[in-house]
Structures are given as structure tokens and as C-alpha cells.
């Protein structure tokens, strides 16, 4: 038997997990998410639907699915979202169908949602969910990062700082906490969490058959 055949024979099916990364705006969540997706082919980004205007450089269907309020409200009424919320007067939501398909195929889904979205996901999918909150190294550093965003005016920065304070008060509702002082270290920590969570017994859907195949009783 070749090495490839041995590797195939040792494959144990698993159910994918839902990995939530949350942080206040400017804490580095997007950078960490991008690196994780580049490093790991077994995880894909959940594409949320939003009613906010498209920003320069964004691609419809990749960064977000952009929709008008009427379409969004109809999907809410039809219970087609895993979670949805209103942020800065715009609606955001995660469609159910593509997420469930990915999990059933044994792949993981990365979510970029706030604490409200995380609570809703936890309510309906606790066994599938792993949540991580990313904190900035300091409030001063967070404000500096926000001011560095050309598209955000001073009044917008003030609003985001106020919201950041509120968001950070929910840090203790998450499974894991990472202080993002160094991006590479933060990415490595997320990868370590992901590796361990994938090995949890509850997610090893093919483990029972594997063990029985060795003549071990349940």
C-alpha cells in the first residue's frame, strides 16, 4: 500500500465547525481572517448579506451579498438566516443553506460577526460553534488604527470608538480571547485553537465506525 493509500485509509469523517471571529472595528479581525483563509484550505468564509452600500474594491458575492431592504426583510420572514442584526442602520445576516452544506461536507465555516450575531449562532448551533474574541493591545492603539482608515471621518471614528467599548464589554461571552499585539502570533493562536477543536470527539462523526473496525466495543 502506498503512502497515499495509507493516508486515505486513515481518513476519519468529521462534521465541520463554525468558527466565529469577533472584535471591535480596527482590532485586526479582518487581517487575521485573511491569513487563516490563505493558510487553511479546509475553511471557507461565510458570505453575509447586507443592505449597506458597496465600498470601493468590494465584490458582490465575495465580500458580501448586497441586497435591498425589501429582499432582506423577505428572507427574515422566511427564516432563511442563521442570524441577522442591524449595525449602523444597515442590516446584516448569514444565509442558512450554504453553511449547512459546507458543514455536512466536513469543512469549516469562518464567520465575521459581532457579539449579537455570535449569541444568535450559539443559541441555534452551540455544538457546531467555536467563538474567539480579538482585543486590541490598548484603546489608544485602537483609536490610532481607526484614524488611519482614510474612508472614516472623525465623527465616524467617534461612533466606532463608542461602539468598540460596548463590544469589548462582551469579551467574557466567548470561548477564547486573543489580544492582537502581533498579527502572526494571533494567527498562530487561532490555528492552534482550530486544530484542537477539530479533534473533539463530538465532531468526529466517523470515529465510531473506525473504532468498531478495530474490534473495540462502543
Where are these regions (language model features)?
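NTP-dependent small-molecule kinase module
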Residues: 2-6, 151-152, 166-218
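P-loop (Walker A) phosphate-binding loop of NTP-binding proteins
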Residues: 22-24
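ATP-binding Walker
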Residues: 27
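Hydrophobic/aromatic beta-strand patches that form the interior of the parallel beta-sheet core
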Residues: 46, 65, 130-132, 176-178
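Residue-level preference for the first positions of well-ordered beta-strands
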Residues: 16-20, 108-110
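N-terminal phosphate/diphosphate-binding loop that engages ATP/GTP or pyrophosphate donors
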Residues: 31-80
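ATP-dependent NMP and nucleoside kinases share a basic, alpha-helical "lid"
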Residues: 70-80, 94-150, 168
